[in-house]
């Protein structure tokens, strides 16, 4: 791998790259210079598992770290270009940045404004908010296969579902094309400001969290409307099970919004994941709803200290 132009690091700790600030090291950590550099890296070691990491906003890295190569796209993958109502964004572009740029150009991608993460991650998990999903605006994506081959992914290829897509394992999205409805920039800006105010009022935005911990049992996102009477929301069933504010070590289900798992200071990945599993158990016992993790959990457990 001597011809790579990006940055390659062995045994790179990952905790400082995740919002929850937990987790062990990755065997390899690579930040490619561009798509050609990324393709060369992928071809160089076909047997090694790879994991694509965005900004670490929806992620628990377990305490034992990751026996894989972690790829993090950076400056060479965050450009944004707008042509009419079509928006072409690098996979590393932040969702919020794309929403703002699109709004300024009169394109409505406002649902992305409050979603923490990158556009590549938004495609992989069909991110959505306020009743709109990536699937609703997705046109196509450029990607590299695990073998380093450039491909184009269509909506049919990805088979979007609630918080899921059929992105092939090892595939790295590099660029995404979206198309949103037209709108007046001032109105779009006002809508995003309203969304941000609602988030600030209802979510623990100043705490160390990974965003929504569990998917809504109903299988769709909240619309955010006052008249949305749908009851099968993750936060509601967690509340019904009496788990708002529950703690395990330094891990806590937020008292402000019980579907947010919080590192109150010094929590381990094991504590966070264990509390999440306890919540799932209590919710099923109390309500009959099976919660499914929305936060991605990767890596090996840490060693248990001797008694």
Swiss-Prot record:
Keywords: Cell cycle, Cell division, Cell shape, Cell wall biogenesis/degradation, Cytoplasm, FAD, Flavoprotein, NADP, Oxidoreductase, Peptidoglycan synthesis. It catalyses: UDP-N-acetyl-alpha-D-muramate + NADP(+) = UDP-N-acetyl-3-O-(1-carboxyvinyl)-alpha-D-glucosamine + NADPH + H(+). It holds the Pfam family MurB_C. The lineage of its organism: Bacteria, Pseudomonadati, Pseudomonadota, Alphaproteobacteria, Rhodobacterales. It is found in: Cytoplasm. Pathway: Cell wall biogenesis; peptidoglycan biosynthesis. It comes from the Bacteria. Residues 21-183 form the FAD-binding PCMH-type domain. GO terms for molecular function: FAD binding; UDP-N-acetylmuramate dehydrogenase activity. Residues 200-227 are annotated as: Disordered. The active site is at 163, 212 (proton donor), 294. This is UDP-N-acetylenolpyruvoylglucosamine reductase. One of its GO terms (biological process) is peptidoglycan biosynthetic process. Its cofactor is FAD. The keyword Cell wall biogenesis/degradation applies. SUPFAM superfamilies: FAD-binding/transporter-associated domain-like, Uridine diphospho-N-Acetylenolpyruvylglucosamine reductase, MurB, C-terminal domain. Cell wall formation.
């Amino acid at each position: 791998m001597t011809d790579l132009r990006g940055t390659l690091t062995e045994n790179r700790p990952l905790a400082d790259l995740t919002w929850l600030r937990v987790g062990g090291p990755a065997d390899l950590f690579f930040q490619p210079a561009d798509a050609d550099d990324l393709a060369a890296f992928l071809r160089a070691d076909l047997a090694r598992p790879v994991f694509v990491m965005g900004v670490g906003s929806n992620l628990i890295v377990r305490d034992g770290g990751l026996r894989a190569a972690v790829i993090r796209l950076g400056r060479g993958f965050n450009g944004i270009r707008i042509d009419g109502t079509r928006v072409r964004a690098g996979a590393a572009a932040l969702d919020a940045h794309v929403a703002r740029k699109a709004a300024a150009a009169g394109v409505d991608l406002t649902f992305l404004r409050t979603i923490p993460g990158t556009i590549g991650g938004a495609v992989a998990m069909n991110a959505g908010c306020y009743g709109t999903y990536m699937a609703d605006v997705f046109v196509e994506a450029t990607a590299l296969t695990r073998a380093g081959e450039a491909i184009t992914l269509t909506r049919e290829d990805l088979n979007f579902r609630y918080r899921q897509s059929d992105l092939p394992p090892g595939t790295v999205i590099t660029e995404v094309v979206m198309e949103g409805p037209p709108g007046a920039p001032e109105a779009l800006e006002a809508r995003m400001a309203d969304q941000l105010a609602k988030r600030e009022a209802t979510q623990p935005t100043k705490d160390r969290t990974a965003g929504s911990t569990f998917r809504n049992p109903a299988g769709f996102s909240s619309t955010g409307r006052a008249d949305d009477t749908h009851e099968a929301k993750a936060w509601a069933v967690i509340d019904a099970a009496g788990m708002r504010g529950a703690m395990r070590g330094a891990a806590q289900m937020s008292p402000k919004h019980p579907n947010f798992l919080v590192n109150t200071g010094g929590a381990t990945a094991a504590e966070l994941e264990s509390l999440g599993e306890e919540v799932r158990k209590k919710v099923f016992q109390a309500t009959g709803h099976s919660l499914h993790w929305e936060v991605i959990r990767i890596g090996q457990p840490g060693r248990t200290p001797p008694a």
